[in-house]
């Protein structure tokens, strides 16, 4: 029930935002929530890639190991050229928004805010974290947020404690991270956005280019068998063809306005047993002590040999 309520609220926020600020450049993680039970498919692909078709670099920084019940941070870097603009929903130039998803191992969660350090609070200022669903607290979402301020997103995380949860075990675990900058090329409904390349639906000659609603263009192609095929191109992409041009089916009718993209990366983290660390420290101490004793013994023998005149 809570998930449906959160999705309803998200939809209302989306609708209001489009009415109030139609030129904004969004990267909505909750669209994935509405269409997929998990953000990661069986193939390993994160579902954001189904709408954001361009591949871009995403980096993740996580500690090599953590102790139980410990607050730590994971950093997701979503780099792009500073000052870069893209096509908004109304065809205007807008700044890029970014979003991120972090799939943690079972038991790992967002750290309670009362355990955040002052540094964590500063690093996460202006960032809102949400769970993918009520029953998946280990899957965290961020975005959309302004990319010019957040090309690095820091997640304050809490490691589980096997002493209080029998389902958790010490060992190595995988994290799955996705980062997106800019708008998608395809909506979850399957329709193209105005941030995509539009292609010819059929081979033929461009017979007409007419103005449509909301700044769109309606392009008519006459095929060899006399049929007239139309393609509506929304405001934003620039036409590459003129009336009288011959085009092949699948040929680009517009430029590619997209400057963003999505990337994913896997990382590993070890939930370390503190007893093993103490044992390792004790082993190192024993080795160091043994080396010291050997050195002292050697010096003692050398002194005895020197006293006996046996060099």
Swiss-Prot record:
Pfam families: Apocytochr_F_C (PF01333), Apocytochr_F_N (PF16639). Binds 1 heme group covalently. Residues 1-27 form the signal peptide. GO terms for molecular function: electron transfer activity; heme binding; iron ion binding. Its main location: membrane. Coiled coil: none annotated. Its cofactor is heme. Heme binds at residues 28, 48, 51-52. It is a single-pass membrane protein. One of its GO terms (biological process) is photosynthesis. GO terms for cellular component: plasma membrane-derived thylakoid membrane. Keywords: Electron transport, Heme, Iron, Membrane, Metal-binding, Photosynthesis, Signal, Thylakoid, Transmembrane, Transmembrane helix, Transport. Disulfide bonds: none annotated. It is found in: Cellular thylakoid membrane. The chain crosses the membrane at residues 277-297. InterPro entries: Cyt-f_TM, Cyt_f, Cyt_f_lg_dom, Cyt_f_lg_dom_sf, Rudment_hybrid_motif. The 4 large subunits of the cytochrome b6-f complex are cytochrome b6, subunit IV (17 kDa polypeptide, PetD), cytochrome f and the Rieske protein, while the 4 small subunits are PetG, PetL, PetM and PetN. The complex functions as a dimer. Belongs to the cytochrome f family. NCBIfam families: PRK02693.1 (NF002736). PANTHER family: CYTOCHROME F, PTHR33288. Component of the cytochrome b6-f complex, which mediates electron transfer between photosystem II (PSII) and photosystem I (PSI), cyclic electron flow around PSI, and state transitions. This is Cytochrome f. The gene is petA.
